[in-house]
Structures are given as structure tokens and as C-alpha cells.
Amino acid sequence: LNETIKGVMQLNKKIPIGYIPAGTMNDFASAIGIPKDMPAAAQKIVDGSLVTVDIGSFNQEYFTYIAAFGVFTAVSYATDQQLKNSLGIMAYLVEAMKEYQESWQKYHMTVKYDDVVIEDDFIFGMIANSMSVGGIKGLAGSDVWLDDGIFEGVLIKYPKNLAEFHMTLNALA
């Protein structure tokens, strides 16, 4: 989907895209009402029902679902497909625990939005246009619309001590 969107955006034309989901969680497909069943998804394309969604960009790279950095961002790619098939969302948690055992890299950033400036170290950040991320509903907020021109942002600060570390883990659980 991402490569298709990138190609269409480079054409600088509004062209409808048909999408048949093939992932484990299929958050984006669920958000726009596409069934997980491939023949049913294909039929929805044939029927021609259109959904408009916002497209974000970073340095000529486009996204419609999520752009993220930091801890756990490689989990969906690193998780074994057979494990995903048998355990579903739990497979991601198993992989996340493996990654948790490695050191968390921190990213020093200055973030500006509206009249607010935040400068700190972060272990995770994402810009999302989705009602759920990795099957977890509400992570990007509860008032999410895919075509409102607004992307939701989530930042998780780097824990500076053991108490903050435990609070971070509890918030992620």
C-alpha cells in the first residue's frame, strides 16, 4: 500500500486506489471499512465505494497510516509470520519483549505545535492517521478522523530513572 501511495502521489493526480489487506492486524483496512476476507475486499473495490483519507509526508516519503521512530517500531517486521498466524496480536507482544531486553535508544528532539515547545529525549514517537495501531485501539486518541487534515502525534519520553522506567512500562502495558 505504501509504495502504491508513493507512486500515485508522485504523479500529482488524485487516482483511486483499490486495497486488499494481507496483514495480521489490518488496522488501516478496518478503519476504512475493508473486510479482512480477500474476496470480499476485492468485491468492495469492484463495487466502487470510495473513501477519502489524508496523506502525510516526510522528506518526499508518503504515508497514510503511521510514521514512527524508536522502540518497538521494528516489531511488526521482525515478528515471525508463522507466529503471527498462530498467535495474532500476541505474537507482536512476544517480539516486543525480545526487543525490550535490548537497550532503548534515545532521540533528542524539539517538538513545536500550536504555541507549545517541548525539548526532551524520547524513546518513541509517531504521527498517525488511524483509530488503532498494531491492533491497539485508542493509542493515537479517541477523536480520530481519517480525512480531517489532522494527524495525531504520540511521544514517549526516555525514562530518566527507575521510577519513570516502571511508569513507562505500565503505561505501555
Language-model segment annotations:
Residues N2-I127:
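Catalytic core of DAGKc-family lipid kinases
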Residues L1-N2, G134:
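Short glycine-rich, flexible loops that bind phosphorylated cofactors or substrates
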Residues T73-V75, E119-D121, S132-I136, N161-F165:
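Short acidic/glycine-rich loop or secondary-structure boundary segments that cap or lie
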Residues L83-M90, S132-K137, G141-L162:
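Gly/Ser/Thr-rich active-site loops/lids in small-molecule metabolic enzymes
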Residues M9-Q10, D80-Q81, G141-V144, L169-L172:
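Short, solvent-exposed amphipathic alpha-helical segments in soluble enzyme
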Residues D47-G48, A96-Y107, D147-A173:
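Catalytic phosphate-donor-binding core of small-molecule kinases
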